[in-house]
């Protein structure tokens, strides 16, 4: 009998299929991991304006999903996505403690793509206080990194490294900060810091950028690598290759948005 390593994603459902739980499960499947979702909310989009509407699920229903996945099946790694409330963050933190969960990946999801505003301040503060000290790695973009590190902004490689040091000093075991297209040069730069050394991962920026779901895909790929027994650095490097291929071969799903291609790493990796 062939057994697969298992991973849990605690995230919202993106009805367009590009981000959230849908991106996570696709990524896990592509990397040979049995993925399980615990849905926190359902996100819908207006068909012509693409305006988002978020419908949270009751806290007790989220908890029942966690019990099913963790007690009923078992997990080798887990990640978070959109949590959306301080109460939900508290539930996740308590769950990590209750089951002594390992290989915990926190994707903070504090801002929407292209936005510099923290969406739910009380949830963001709870992530900072409760989940950051409990995680094996956290995967903020530069806006989220500035918030987590108590810095006014993070816009340069030097500031990314400073933020990374502060985030690890605040309790995270490691961090990878996604510079991506927010930095001003022509490279998409992510920087991994494990508390001892920095690893810069730079690839040319990809235009046009069909990047809906890129952050979710990246953190899910890290989670998958950890579930499969890779070291943290190995998991991060594999995830960078996976998401780069997904972006390079991204595609438009309508005339408003384009998504990462989750099959690209398998089909087109060179």
Question: Model-derived features: where do they sit?
Answer:
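Conserved N-terminal subdomain of the carbohydrate kinase-like
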Residues: 2-9, 25-113, 117-118
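Short pre-catalytic strand/loop immediately N-terminal to key active-site residues, enriched for Gly-Thr
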Residues: 10-16, 198-212
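Glycine-rich beta-alpha junction loops
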Residues: 14, 42-43, 84, 110-112, ...
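Phosphate-handling active-site elements
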Residues: 31-36, 198-199, 225-238
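Conserved phosphate/ATP/ADP-binding segment of small-molecule kinases
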Residues: 121-198
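Short, small-residue alpha-helix embedded
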Residues: 146-147, 208-232
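Charged C-terminal helix
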Residues: 233-270
């Amino acid at each position: 009998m062939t057994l697969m390593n298992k991973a849990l994603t605690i995230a919202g459902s993106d009805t367009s299929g590009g981000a959230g739980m849908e991106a996570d499960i696709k990524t896990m499947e592509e990397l040979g991991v049995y993925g399980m979702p615990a849905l926190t909310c359902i996100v819908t989009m207006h068909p012509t304006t693409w305006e988002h509407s978020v419908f949270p699920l009751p806290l007790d229903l989220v908890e029942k999903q966690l019990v099913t996945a963790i007690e009923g099946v078992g997990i080798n790694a887990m990640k978070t996505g959109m949590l959306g409330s301080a109460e939900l963050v508290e539930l996740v933190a308590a769950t990590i403690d209750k089951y002594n969960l390992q290989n915990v990946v926190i994707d903070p999801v504090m801002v929407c793509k292209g936005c510099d505003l923290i969406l739910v301040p009380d949830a963001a503060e709870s992530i900072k206080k409760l989940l950051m000290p409990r995680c094996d790695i956290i995967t903020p973009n530069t806006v989220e990194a500035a918030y987590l590190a108590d810095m006014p902004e993070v816009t340069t490689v030097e500031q990314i490294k400073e933020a990374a040091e502060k985030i690890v000093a605040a309790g995270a075991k490691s961090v990878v900060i996604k510079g991506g297209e927010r930095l001003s040069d022509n490279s998409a730069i992510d920087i991994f810091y494990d508390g001892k050394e920095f690893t810069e991962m730079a690839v040319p920026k990809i235009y046009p950028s069909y990047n809906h779901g890129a952050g979710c895909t990246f953190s899910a790929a890290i989670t998958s690598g950890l579930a499969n027994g890779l070291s943290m650095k190995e998991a991060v490097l594999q995830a960078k290759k996976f998401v780069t291929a997904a972006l390079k071969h991204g595609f438009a799903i309508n005339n408003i948005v384009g998504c990462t291609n989750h099959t690209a790493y398998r089909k087109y990796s060179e």
